[in-house]
């Protein structure tokens, strides 16, 4: 069992551990007593779990650790969508590359070699991403690293290893591609070629900087017509049925019944992934007028038993992302505009607001719901690039062509 030893300006948690069959005493230093108490309680809970055999036998390989990690860390902590994506990464990449390796064999040097090897491996194909001879991307490797780093942080806590070999592992540089999106003038042209429902979806996405899942989750009750505001506090997602049944369902707000026979996925309204995604956005008066003209009879009472969604099929089921995408691409074609994704409207919105606000990143971030300002500043760079060309043209006009 662990104990706390008081020092001059710190506190040490002292306990016995076994590494590679050798029993030894370990000291961990904390600057405050509450931190030391929390660590002591963690160690005691782990000791109780081992004693009750809920963790299972000894964990010696990476594959065994990932199994315990999913059960003790993933299931109680992750949302269904996070569980589904992380399970996919673990299943497809981690056991094939390092599953049989013993935990004691991993070192920072070994991890660097493994990552170099993984970048030469072909990417796993899926119904959405065909293999096509492409290699594993740096972005995917970073996602794999995030899971492995977290798993080995728990392994240190659970006393399977002394230190995390994935800490400060060398990762490939991700060079983000410049994002293609429509200008405000092109969006005005686009809505002229859209049916009313699609036009409303474009207006809302552009004015409120919405993600696609946030747009399709909107209900009429989310709009405050007296204050011209829109409340964004949920998202529409399609999640594997197994993932929904495995993890805690506290983040799921509504589960839509399946259509037809038994399906492997389920459509749900769920809480957003981050707290910053929950926000209230002010809408322009012209858009509020359009919303008032579009709202159906009985919108005030809400949908029972299903939510009264703004974008839904006639039977009340939520509009699918594929339907929205298909209609959007058809409208782009008819308008003679370049092919971009529906999600790019969010980039158009953010860049336009940055330009209008003179680069007020904080104000735009509160509208977009980004947890970090990195994405905002990246788009701001593209806005500034256009401003630089405008400045050159103005310089030419005023200085060189003045005579």
Segment roles from a protein language model:
Residues 157, 203, 207, 214, ...:
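C-terminal catalytic core of tyrosine-transesterase DNA break-rejoin enzymes
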Residues 124-128, 134-138, 142-144, 157, ...:
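Basic, Lys/Arg- and aromatic-enriched nucleic-acid-binding interface segment
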């Amino acid at each position: 069992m662990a104990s706390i030893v008081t020092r001059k300006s710190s506190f040490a948690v002292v306990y016995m551990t076994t590494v590679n069959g050798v029993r030894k005493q370990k000291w961990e230093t904390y600057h405050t007593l509450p931190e030391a108490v929390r660590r002591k309680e963690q160690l005691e809970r782990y000791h109780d779990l081992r004693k009750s055999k809920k963790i299972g036998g000894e964990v010696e390989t990476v594959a065994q650790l990932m199994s315990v990690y999913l059960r003790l860390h993933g299931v109680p902590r992750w949302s269904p969508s996070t569980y589904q994506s992380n399970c996919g990464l673990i299943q497809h990449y981690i056991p094939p590359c390092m599953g049989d390796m013993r935990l004691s064999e991993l070192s920072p040097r070994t991890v660097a070699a493994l990552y170099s090897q993984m970048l030469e491996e072909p990417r796993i194909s899926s119904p959405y991403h065909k293999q096509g001879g492409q290699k594993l991307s740096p972005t995917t490797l970073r996602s794999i690293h995030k899971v492995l780093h977290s798993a080995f942080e728990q392994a240190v806590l659970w006393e399977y290893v002394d230190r995390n070999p994935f800490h400060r592992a060398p990762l490939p540089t991700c060079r983000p591609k410049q994002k293609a999106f429509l200008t405000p003038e092109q969006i005005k042209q686009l809505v002229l070629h859209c049916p009313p429902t699609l036009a409303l979806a474009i207006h809302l996405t552009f004015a409120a900087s919405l993600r696609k899942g946030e747009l399709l989750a909107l209900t009429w009750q989310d709009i405050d017509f007296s204050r011209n505001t829109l409340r964004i506090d949920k998202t529409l997602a399609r999640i594997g049925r197994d993932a929904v049944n495995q993890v805690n369902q506290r983040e799921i707000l509504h589960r839509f019944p399946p259509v037809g026979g038994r399906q492997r996925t389920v459509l749900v309204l769920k809480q957003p992934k981050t707290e910053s995604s929950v926000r209230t956005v002010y809408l322009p008066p012209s858009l509020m007028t359009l919303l008032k003209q579009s709202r159906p009879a009985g919108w005030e009472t809400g949908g029972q038993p299903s939510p009264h969604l703004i974008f839904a099929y006639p039977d009340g089921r939520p509009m699918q992302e594929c339907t929205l995408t298909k209609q959007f691409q058809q409208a782009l074609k008819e308008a003679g505009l370049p092919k971009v994704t529906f999600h790019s409207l969010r980039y158009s919105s953010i860049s336009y607001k940055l330009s209008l606000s003179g680069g007020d990143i904080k104000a735009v971030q509160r509208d977009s719901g980004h947890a970090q300002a990195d994405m905002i500043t990246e788009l701001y760079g593209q806005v500034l690039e256009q401003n630089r060309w405008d400045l050159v043209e103005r310089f030419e006009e005023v200085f060189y062509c003045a005579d």
